[in-house]
């Protein structure tokens, strides 16, 4: 968590404490509530910061060239909602930009990848759409182009396939052949020709792959953190009831449409931004809590500045679960990831 963010929420929580009156000794211990509109505005701002921090972004992506709808629909079918691969894994859909298609038989595809350095690639598949001009059997060879090279000998053969049907095809690529680009730019050359001896090939060469139309090629990548983190057991706690003054979980649903973020967050439509609130009598002090969380980190900072007596106990999260997101990054790639510790499931007294 960055220092400016801590200072921002420090100010907000101080405002909350002042609104609750001098009798309250902890910002989550109950007392007078904020007005509903003010509370909702605070929740929405917290949701924005929580999502950006969880995705390691400084600002929301600006989508200037969204992927074609047909290709995006196909890609989203590959990325179903739910948990991604174990070990803090991610799934990424990267759409191709055609940088050279002067020949009917050859195309150069450019992909702008945004794989974190702390992750490694372990699975890669290329999706291509074969046009109805398919002459019979097609021989497709996929090469990787090295950086700053233009000679024919600079390319490396990754895969070779024979195709006999039109429509979408998925081609597995060796993940080892796609690693090592520090710039994040990957270039693949497709050499697509009718199989030699095919009697149906007549006349001028015709384009066989849809590389620039609505069926845009894309890469399906799976990446995993180098040092997977351990999972946490899930625990639940009752939600706050109107007549319950003790520490409990207060539930808020945040719709991404309300945030104005539906253009880059594809799934889900929203999530539960829960937080902990209520009184912590002395006999509840020291209940299990999570020290290294966004919620309790701010409270710990406040307590370190000694605004309350040393014996004060605060209502903080004791269990969290991840949030699975499908979103478009700054390069227009579709990313599927589980953001850890996003949804509060249980609360307790620190």
UniProtKB/Swiss-Prot annotation:
Residues 20-236 form a propeptide. Keywords: Cleavage on pair of basic residues, Disulfide bond, Glycoprotein, Growth factor, Hormone, Secreted, Signal. Coiled coil: none annotated. CDD domains: TGF_beta_INHBC_E. SMART domains: TGFB. Residues 1-19 form the signal peptide. InterPro entries: Cystine-knot_cytokine (IPR029034), Inhibin_betaC (IPR001318), TGF-b_C (IPR001839), TGF-beta-rel (IPR015615), TGFb_CS (IPR017948). One of its GO terms (molecular function) is cytokine activity. Disulfide bonds join 240-248, 247-315, 276-347, 280-349. It is found in: Secreted. Belongs to the TGF-beta family. PANTHER family: INHIBIN BETA E CHAIN (PTHR11848:SF6), TGF-BETA FAMILY (PTHR11848). Homodimeric or heterodimeric through association with alpha and beta subunits, linked by one or more disulfide bonds. Inhibins are heterodimers of one alpha and one beta subunit. Activins are homo- or heterodimers of beta subunits only. This is Inhibin beta E chain.
């Amino acid at each position: 968590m960055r220092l400016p963010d801590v200072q921002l929420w420090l100010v907000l929580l101080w405002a909350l404490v002042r609104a609750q009156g001098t009798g309250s000794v902890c910002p989550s211990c109950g007392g007078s509530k904020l007005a509903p509109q003010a509370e909702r505005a605070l929740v929405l701002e917290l949701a924005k910061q929580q999502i950006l921090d969880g995705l390691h972004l400084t600002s929301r992506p600006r989508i200037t060239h969204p992927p074609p709808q047909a290709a995006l629909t196909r890609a989203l079918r590959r990325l179903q909602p739910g948990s991604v691969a174990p070990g803090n894994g991610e799934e990424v859909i990267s759409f191709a930009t055609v940088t050279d298609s002067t020949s009917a038989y050859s195309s150069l595809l450019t992909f702008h990848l945004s794989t974190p350095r702390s992750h490694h690639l372990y699975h890669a598949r290329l999706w291509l759409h074969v046009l109805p001009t398919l002459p019979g059997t097609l021989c497709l060879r996929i090469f990787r182009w090295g950086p700053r090279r233009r000679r024919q000998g600079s390319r490396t053969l990754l895969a070779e396939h024979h195709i006999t049907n039109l429509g979408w095809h998925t081609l597995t690529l060796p993940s080892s052949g796609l690693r090592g680009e520090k710039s994040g730019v990957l270039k693949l050359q497709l050499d697509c020709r009718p199989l030699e001896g095919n009697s149906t090939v007549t006349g001028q060469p015709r384009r066989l792959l849809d590389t620039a139309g609505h069926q845009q090629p894309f890469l399906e990548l799976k990446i995993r953190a180098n040092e997977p983190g351990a999972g946490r057991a899930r625990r639940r706690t009752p939600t706050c009831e109107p007549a319950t003054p003790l520490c409990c979980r207060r539930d808020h649903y945040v719709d991404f449409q309300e945030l104005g973020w539906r253009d880059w967050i594809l799934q889900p439509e929203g999530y539960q931004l829960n937080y902990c609130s209520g009184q912590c009598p002395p006999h509840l002090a020291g209940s299990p809590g999570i020290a290294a969380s966004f919620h309790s980190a701010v409270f710990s900072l406040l307590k370190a500045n000694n605004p309350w007596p040393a014996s004060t106990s605060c209502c903080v999260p004791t269990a969290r679960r991840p949030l699975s997101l499908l979103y478009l990054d700054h390069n227009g790639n579709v990313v599927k990831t589980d953001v850890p510790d996003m949804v509060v499931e249980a609360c307790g007294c620190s």
